């Protein structure tokens, strides 16, 4: 069967990966009973990820004719004689209105019916939600015959929960194995000690001999001390003087070292604060510059972790520097830039088990709020949605970050107002999943 690109705008793209079969029609009947049969309508609808009844109904609405789709046989009929080119043109209009994303033009979309009975298209490629014109006649048919929803978000949450449970079980199993190994070592050490006591009588005797020897040595040392005190010869006196001098010189060296450390300490601190915090802007600029130079080298993303771990600055400062280096000067189109460079953020967000995602969210808030980037501030919700869809940030961390921000020192920041729709969406999705469970 011949294939063609989905969408008239992609007709001449030889490398376009979204394809559908070319339409094949057949005219049946005569007179008033003449009908047009769209033979491969089921295959076309399958390629578009839409029910075949939608395309059949759309042809009938646009042509002002009765249409019928038989679910059992897969037959699509439209009353009247219509040529293939005319129906193919109507199909292109259907694709443009009900299949392609209004943002990126990608046909990989899903029909979503909102609580307010509005038909939207959710793009799996860019995440854009397109609002379909509800004045179209087909929208009423879609509301009455909604498509089967793919529970992608629920599956993701279930997989995440299962993954967390699996990790916890693995940690518990590791702890149990460690305990078993420790018990085995203790038992083996006990057995070795028993066997050594039973089979080596010489070893039982030798400790007593050593103890006696030590006692003799101590007595000899005591005797030596008495001899030194009673020995008044010139050689003994000189020896004692040398020992005293060596002890005094050692004390003097220790005192001088302590004085040097005390002198150095005030230089590193001032009023309880490290000098590093007294003049942060130049150091932050240097850190951002280092990040930019590293990114210009074109090093693989896998090497980013080792580079970050080699830095001595606090984790939050490192994340701020990386974010500024990646998106310096970006305003409009901030969400698209984040999607392009998501791999860098994913690598940075997995540096630590706890805290890296929070550092990333703080960097986003600083970049959009404190820096006064109004264009980026408008797209902050889209940025969080993109990172959430890519599993770079988790729902619990976002909610925790939002709650702390509303009650923290930066509660007046405009970031929280722009983030609120995304947070409400997360909370509503969570409540719906709990109700269904």
Curated annotation (Swiss-Prot):
InterPro entries: ARM-type_fold, IF2/IF5, Transl_init_fac_IF2/IF5_dom, Transl_init_fac_IF2/IF5_N, Transl_init_fac_IF2/IF5_Zn-bd, W2_domain. GTP binds at residues 29-36. Residues 213-226 have a biased composition (Acidic residues). The modification Phosphoserine is found at residues 201, 428, 431, 433. One of its GO terms (cellular component) is cytoplasm. Phosphorylated at Ser-201, Thr-230, Ser-428, Ser-431, and Ser-433 by CK2. Residues 148-179, 191-212 have a biased composition (Basic and acidic residues). Pfam families: eIF-5_eIF-2B, W2. Residues 148-231, 262-284 are annotated as: Disordered. GO terms for molecular function: GTP binding; translation initiation factor activity. The modification Phosphothreonine is found at residue 230. Catalyzes the hydrolysis of GTP bound to the 40S ribosomal initiation complex (40S.mRNA.Met-tRNA[F].eIF-2.GTP) with the subsequent joining of a 60S ribosomal subunit resulting in the release of eIF-2 and the guanine nucleotide. The subsequent joining of a 60S ribosomal subunit results in the formation of a functional 80S initiation complex (80S.mRNA.Met-tRNA[F]). This is Probable eukaryotic translation initiation factor 5-2. It comes from Arabidopsis thaliana.
């Amino acid at each position: 069967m011949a294939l063609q690109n989905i969408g008239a705008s992609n007709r001449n793209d030889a490398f376009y990966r979204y394809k559908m079969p070319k339409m094949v029609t057949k005219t049946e009947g005569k007179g008033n009973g003449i009908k047009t049969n769209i033979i491969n309508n089921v295959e076309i609808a399958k390629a578009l990820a839409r029910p075949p009844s939608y395309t059949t109904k759309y042809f009938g609405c646009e042509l002002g004719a009765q249409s019928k789709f038989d679910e059992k046989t897969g037959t699509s009929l439209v009353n009247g004689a219509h040529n293939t080119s005319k129906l193919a043109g109507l199909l292109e209009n259907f694709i443009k209105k009900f299949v392609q994303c209004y943002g990126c033009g990608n046909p990989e979309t899903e029909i979503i019916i909102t609580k307010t009975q509005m038909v939207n298209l959710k793009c799996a490629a860019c995440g854009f939600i397109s609002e379909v014109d509800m004045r179209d006649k087909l929208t009423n048919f879609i509301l009455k015959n909604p498509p089967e929803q793919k529970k992608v978000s629920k599956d993701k949450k279930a997989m995440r929960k299962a993954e967390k449970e699996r990790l916890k079980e693995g940690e518990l199993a590791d702890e149990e194995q460690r305990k078993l190994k420790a018990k085995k070592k203790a038992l083996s050490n006990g057995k070795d000690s028993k066997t050594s006591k039973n089979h080596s009588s010489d070893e039982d005797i030798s400790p007593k001999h050593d103890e006696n020897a030590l006692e003799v040595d101590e007595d000899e040392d005591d005797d030596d001390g008495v001899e030194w005190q009673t020995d008044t010869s010139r050689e003994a006196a000189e020896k004692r003087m040398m020992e005293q001098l060596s002890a005094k010189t050692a004390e003097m060296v220790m005192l001088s070292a302590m004085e040097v450390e005390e002198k150095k300490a005030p230089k590193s601190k001032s009023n309880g604060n490290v000098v590093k915090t007294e003049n942060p802007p130049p150091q932050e600029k240097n850190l951002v510059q280092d990040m930019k130079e590293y990114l210009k080298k074109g090093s693989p993303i896998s090497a980013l972790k080792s580079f970050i771990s080699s830095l001595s600055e606090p984790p939050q400062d490192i994340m701020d520097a990386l974010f500024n280096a990646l998106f310096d000067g970006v305003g409009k189109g901030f969400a698209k830039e984040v999607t392009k460079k998501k791999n860098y953020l994913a690598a940075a967000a997995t540096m630590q088990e706890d805290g890296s995602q929070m550092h990333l969210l703080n960097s986003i808030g600083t970049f959009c709020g404190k820096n006064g980037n109004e264009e980026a501030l408008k797209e902050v919700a889209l940025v969080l949605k993109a990172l959430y869809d890519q599993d770079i940030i988790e729902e619990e961390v976002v909610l925790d970050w939002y709650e702390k921000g509303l009650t923290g020192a930066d509660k007046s920041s405009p970031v929280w107002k722009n983030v609120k729709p995304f947070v409400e969406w997360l909370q509503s999705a969570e409540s719906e999943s709990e109700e269904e469970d």
